Swiss-Prot record:
Enzyme Commission number, as recorded: 4.1.1.39
Enzyme class: lyase
Cell compartment(s), UniProt: Plastid, Chloroplast
Modification type N6-carboxylysine: residues: K184
Protein's name according to its UniProt entry: Ribulose bisphosphate carboxylase large chain
Active site: residue positions: K158 (proton acceptor), H276 (proton acceptor)
Family, per entry: Belongs to the RuBisCO large chain family. Type I subfamily.
């Protein structure tokens, strides 16, 4: 009877300092949704399965999480949105590990629930202030790169596994020389028998430095420093710094604590930190269980990464357009207002934490440039992996096609044209004087990955009359 034990309080007045969480609760048949929601509140804060006398030794009314609102999810029969408030004192300052151990620690295996999903959180300013936030942030990154008013362009070296160091460096050089700002290691290239990390760093940085000399622009290659232990990660990152790299990357799978450590290292060493969300779909893709990717975006902004993969709107990986825009908003805005159709359930003030740059990658190509610029805006890294490396005339041509497509779209935008409607025409005009772009448009004109997303918003705007 969690509800009777004080974990259900419909009259609770939310404090500015409370951490708020929204769970999608699917109770087992016969379990009352309010009771199920109170159980989630209890099991993620102070309760255990029975009443214990040691409760009397604590200020237990203060430390109980309170479920304060339960709504049925539209168009479902057995799912409910449970709003839960946690007192800020339940959490250790500046520790994502502790936050997740509480909120997502034990409740997901709870028997009274068929499934449970963490949909959104509101982190109070007082709590956010205990986190460093992004090491560099989008403003400083633009100043370091000397690139303003347009998205950054990147590409991932393909094939992701099997290249030797020298050939890997060639790919980096050609992509950057063709006009990209960044090339990146893939998430699973660390230090394998076919190419050890030091060899890759040396050849890649040679490619970067030559491309910079040729183009006169600042460029970078995301050197993946992911490794088995924190000591090895630091060793690789230090070596990358000695070679003059401006950016390193880590995978989400190294864990929240390691990511926070790397973010602190990155700020101390004036390094941009790119986070690849490797492994996130294991818990973020299903609609009824796990957690929503936007929660990870929020945690990662607190942890302090500069780039995070946030979905593409038009590519090959999972992501509903509306929700992808929202994941991007969580990363970039200074204060996000509640927006139910986008799945943003709470207002969130980010205090003075810097902004993360969202990264769009996976199955995008230059023929979609107008849509990408429209949906994602300018503070984003557009990564064309196959869209660069897969160009018939070679990597440098693929890079040039992407850069020309982007620049033509930005010029049209600056001239005040409707670049979304005129997008295909703008690209065609630009392609008249750029062979590689023409080739790319001809090759990929019809490719798009049209599957319905498994993770879509539940609350949809419905048109009302007389407005």
């Amino acid at each position: 009877p969690y509800a009777k034990m004080g974990y259900w309080d419909p009259d609770y007045v939310v404090k500015d300092t409370d951490v708020l969480a929204l769970f999608r609760v699917s109770p087992q048949p016969g379990v009352d949704p309010v009771e199920a929601s109170a159980a989630v509140a209890g099991e993620s804060s102070t309760a255990t399965w029975t009443v214990v006398w040691t409760d009397l030794l604590t200020a237990c009314d203060l430390y109980r999480a309170k479920a304060y609102k339960v709504d049925a999810v539209p168009n479902t029969t057995d799912q409910y949105f449970a709003y839960i408030a946690y007192d800020i004192d339940l959490f250790e300052e500046g520790s994502i590990a502790n936050l997740t151990a509480s909120i997502x620690g034990x409740v997901f295996g709870f028997k009274a629930l068929k499934a449970l999903r963490l949909e959104d959180m509101r982190l109070p300013v007082a709590y956010l202030k205990t986190f460093q936030g992004p090491a560099t942030g989008v403003i400083c990154e633009r100043e370091r790169m000397d690139k303003f008013g347009r998205p950054f362009l990147g590409a991932t070296v393909k094939p992701k596994l099997g290249l030797s160091g020298k050939n890997y460096g060639r790919v980096v050089y050609e992509g950057l020389k063709g006009g990209l700002d960044f090339l990146k290691d893939d998430e699973n290239i660390n230090s394998q028998p076919f190419m050890r990390w030091k060899e890759r760093y040396l050849y890649s940085m040679e490619g970067v430095n030559r491309a910079i000399a040729a183009a006169g622009e600042t460029k970078g290659h995301y050197l993946n420093v992911t490794a088995a232990t924190m000591e090895q990660i630091y060793e690789r990152a230090e070596f990358a710094k000695q070679l003059g790299s401006i950016i390193v990357m880590v995978d989400l799978v190294i864990g929240y604590t390691a990511i926070q450590s790397m973010a602190i290292w990155a700020r101390k060493n004036d390094m941009i930190l790119h986070l690849h969300r490797a492994g996130n779909s294991t818990y973020s893709r299903q609609k009824i269980h796990g957690m929503n990717f936007r929660v990870i975006c929020k945690w990662m902004r607190m942890a302090g990464v500069d780039h995070i993969h946030a979905g593409t709107v038009v590519g090959k990986l999972e992501g509903d357009p509306v929700x992808x825009x929202x994941x991007x908003x969580x990363x970039x805005x200074x204060x996000x207002x509640x927006n139910l159709p986008q799945g943003i359930f709470f207002e969130q003030d980010w205090a003075s934490l810097r902004k993360v740059t969202p990264v769009a990658s996976g199955g995008i190509h230059c023929g979609q440039m107008h849509q990408l610029l429209d949906y994602l805006g300018v503070d984003v890294v557009l990564q064309f992996g196959g869209g660069t490396i897969g160009h018939p005339d070679g990597i440098q041509a693929g890079a040039t096609a992407n850069r020309v497509a982007l620049e033509s779209m930005v010029i049209a935008r600056n001239e005040g044209r409707d670049f979304v409607a005129e997008g295909p025409q703008i690209l065609q005009d630009a392609a008249k004087t750029c062979g590689p772009l023409q080739t790319a448009l001809d090759l990929w004109k019809d490719i798009s990955f049209n599957y319905t997303s498994t993770d879509t918003a539940d609350l949809v705007e419905t048109p009302t009359a007389n407005v």
